[in-house]
């Protein structure tokens, strides 16, 4: 089990690598409805804000731990699999700005069974040792939306 950060002294890279490891464990254990969100919660501020592009099937703004749990449930309803194939930390947020993470995804849509490989670039703000804001940028939200809906 991934250990949560130890408060405000946790550097952003430690927080991010810990969160991504905890997220992988959470999803491997079945994700929403099957696994507890509790191991992920310490990595996120109680007031965390996640901004997803409105064009996505799980688009919108998600607030707090409950919002994050609802987001993971909505996302797992869309994707049968969502694998983080490769991840690169382009900026770690240690200079006061947001961290920037490039993740290459391979996913299979639950509704259509079709697969897509695509990059996601995220800006992530870490405040007091916890993730306070996440802004994912998908290369092509239209392709994701088209892939996930039945004709």
Labelled PLM ranges:
Residues 1-151:
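C-terminal and inter-domain tail/linker signature
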């Amino acid at each position: 089990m991934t250990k949560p950060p130890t408060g405000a002294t946790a550097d952003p890279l430690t927080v991010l690598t810990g969160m991504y490891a905890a997220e992988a464990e959470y999803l491997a254990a079945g994700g929403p409805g099957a696994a507890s969100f509790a191991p992920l919660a310490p990595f996120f501020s109680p007031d965390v804000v996640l901004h997803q592009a409105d064009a996505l099937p799980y688009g919108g703004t998600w607030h707090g731990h409950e919002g994050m749990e609802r987001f993971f449930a909505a996302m797992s309803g869309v994707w049968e699999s969502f694998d983080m194939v490769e991840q690169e930390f382009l900026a770690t947020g240690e200079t006061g700005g947001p961290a920037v993470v490039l993740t290459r995804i391979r996913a299979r849509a639950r509704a259509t069974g079709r697969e897509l490989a695509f990059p996601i670039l995220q800006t992530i703000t870490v405040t007091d040792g916890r993730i306070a804001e996440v802004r994912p940028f998908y290369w092509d939200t239209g392709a994701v939306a088209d892939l996930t809906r039945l004709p």
